[in-house]
């Protein structure tokens, strides 16, 4: 999916949490309805078959309960996207990445090949299943991962065995670490630990810009990779590091140069998003003019960097909702020209499906440590709401999305608000900002109060109390969301082209 990701190490976050956040964006012209779900062990398949690639995999018989954000409309797979399991391991998958022709030739993607002819007749060729994809990964890994590293290991083994039909980035987190895995070609992969004092920005582009092969093949303190990566790179001359003697890759090399892309479309679709996110979190750098450290089209924007101050939930929401505010590239702005205002792909876009922020709080007990913040629809007009993950069920307001358009659930209410507010952006702006700030404040207080309420409970009683807290807060969110929908509907209705100032009737 065309998504945007930000990862925040525990020493760079406002409260010591590891933070993993990703927009799931539908393809252009598609608006995929989403919902929240808790998947129980008896609901997890023991034999899994992918809808898109027709790949069948036997799964272990000991899955854990986990949260997910699946598609609503059936027919093209689960697309579970993001969640936590019972051990407070988080996973967000996937960020679609780019690659290059050399990698595609060295390790082709594993595409599904339909059968040819009719079975039993001469010339019949059976279908060949494809590899793994975004449709599958959370379902295949999250129920079994015991730590962030373990999630990397499990997915890495699956990739080496079955391959993949697309290039993807995947985040794994626990209370101590965040790991970012990038697939390389059909069967290869690398993974890097996010520095504790740094954040990572990821548009739809292979991002890791420094990788230590010796560490990946040895202690694996900060790097992991597919078993034959060094030999494969040497065979196909993939390392582009200058001055390296011999045929093999450098011990420390730049994967973005070796495996990634620097295309014209990257400079319109991808690099501007990394530029703006880092502009927000490191504002003292020079971002504009001829002396700029980085421009929207720079190919060397760092994968990770230390922020100027600690990063909050609100910072994450802002950058993942952004449309280049304060620059000539803002599609709603007045700076620049019509050409500059439409030059680059916004992060907060009309086809945001959902945003999941996975927070693991070290100061909270394991029974209520994991909080999954959720937003649906276009991020420029929605609000994040917190949900405790250690629960048996999700509130109906978040879980009961249907294909039918209605204002009775959080997904469709936010879709309606976004479509109405977009056309009267400035007139609706104050109401939207007030809603976002109020719901955000309510969310922080909700978590603080619920933490206190469960702190002295026996562990076995905590999930039920957390579920009640989630449900009560969802009802408060419903009230605020309905009120905002009414406000933007009124504002946009008043501005309809067929309005007329003379009254026929006054009540």
Residues of each region from the PLM?
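Short, well-ordered beta-strand elements within core beta-sheets of diverse protein domains
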Residues: 138-144
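A contiguous strand-loop segment
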Residues: 2-134, 154-293
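Soluble extracytoplasmic regions of secretory-pathway and membrane proteins
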Residues: 21-35, 96, 181-183, 319-330, ...
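Glycine-rich, aromatic-lined ligand/substrate-binding cores of catalytic
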Residues: 231-368
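Substrate-recognition/cap regions that form aromatic- and gly/pro-loop-enriched pockets
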Residues: 324-325, 329-456
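Histidine-centered catalytic/metal-binding microenvironments
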Residues: 436-507
């Amino acid at each position: 999916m065309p998504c945007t990701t930000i990862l925040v190490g525990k020493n760079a976050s406002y409260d010591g949490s590891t933070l993993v956040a990703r927009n799931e964006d539908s393809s252009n012209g598609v608006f995929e309805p989403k919902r929240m779900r808790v998947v129980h062990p008896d609901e997890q398949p023991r034999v899994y078959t992918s809808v898109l690639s027709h790949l069948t995999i036997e799964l272990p018989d000991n899955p854990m309960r986990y949260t997910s954000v699946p598609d609503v409309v059936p027919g093209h797979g689960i697309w579970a996207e993001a969640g936590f399991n019972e051990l407070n391991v988080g996973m967000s998958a996937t960020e679609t990445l780019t690659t290059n022709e050399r990698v595609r030739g060295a390790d082709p993607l594993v595409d599904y090949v339909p059968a040819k002819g009719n079975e039993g007749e001469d010339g019949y060729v059976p279908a060949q299943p494809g590899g793994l994809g975004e449709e599958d990964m959370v379902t295949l890994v999250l129920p079994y991962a015991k730590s962030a590293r373990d999630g990397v290991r499990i997915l890495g083994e699956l990739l080496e065995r079955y391959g993949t039909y697309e290039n993807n980035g995947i985040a794994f987190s626990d209370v101590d670490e965040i790991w970012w895995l990038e697939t390389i070609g059909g069967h290869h992969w690398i993974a890097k630990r996010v520095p504790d004092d740094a954040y990572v920005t990821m548009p739809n582009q292979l991002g890791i810009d420094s990788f230590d092969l010796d560490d990946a093949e040895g202690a694996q303190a900060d790097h992991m990779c597919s078993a034959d990566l060094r030999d494969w790179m040497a065979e196909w001359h993939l390392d582009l590091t200058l001055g390296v003697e011999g045929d093999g890759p450098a011990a420390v090399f730049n994967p973005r140069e070796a495996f990634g892309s620097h295309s014209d479309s990257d400079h319109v679709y991808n690099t501007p998003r990394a530029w703006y996110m880092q502009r927000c979190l490191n504002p003292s750098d020079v971002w504009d003019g001829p002396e700029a450290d980085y421009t929207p089209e720079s190919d060397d924007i760092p994968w990770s960097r230390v922020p100027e101050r600690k990063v909050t939930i609100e910072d994450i929401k802002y950058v993942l909702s952004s449309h280049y505010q304060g620059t000539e590239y803002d599609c709603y702005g007045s700076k620049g020209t019509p050409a500059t205002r439409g030059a680059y792909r916004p992060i907060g876009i009309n086809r945001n499906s959902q945003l999941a922020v996975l927070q693991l709080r070290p100061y909270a007990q394991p029974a209520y440590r994991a909080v999954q913040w959720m937003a649906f629809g276009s991020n420029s007009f929605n609000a994040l709401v917190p949900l405790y993950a250690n629960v048996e069920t999700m509130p109906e307001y978040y879980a009961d999305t249907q294909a039918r358009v209605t204002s009775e659930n959080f997904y469709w209410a936010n879709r309606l608000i976004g479509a109405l507010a977009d056309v009267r952006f400035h007139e609706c702006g104050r109401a939207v900002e007030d809603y976002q700030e109020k719901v955000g404040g309510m969310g922080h207080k909700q978590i603080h109060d619920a933490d206190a309420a469960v702190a002295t409970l026996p562990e076995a009683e905590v999930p039920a109390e957390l579920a009640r807290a989630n449900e009560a807060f969802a009802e408060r969110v419903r009230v605020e969301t309905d009120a905002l929908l009414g406000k933007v509907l009124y504002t946009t209705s008043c501005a309809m082209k067929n309005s007329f100032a003379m009254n026929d009737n006054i009540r």
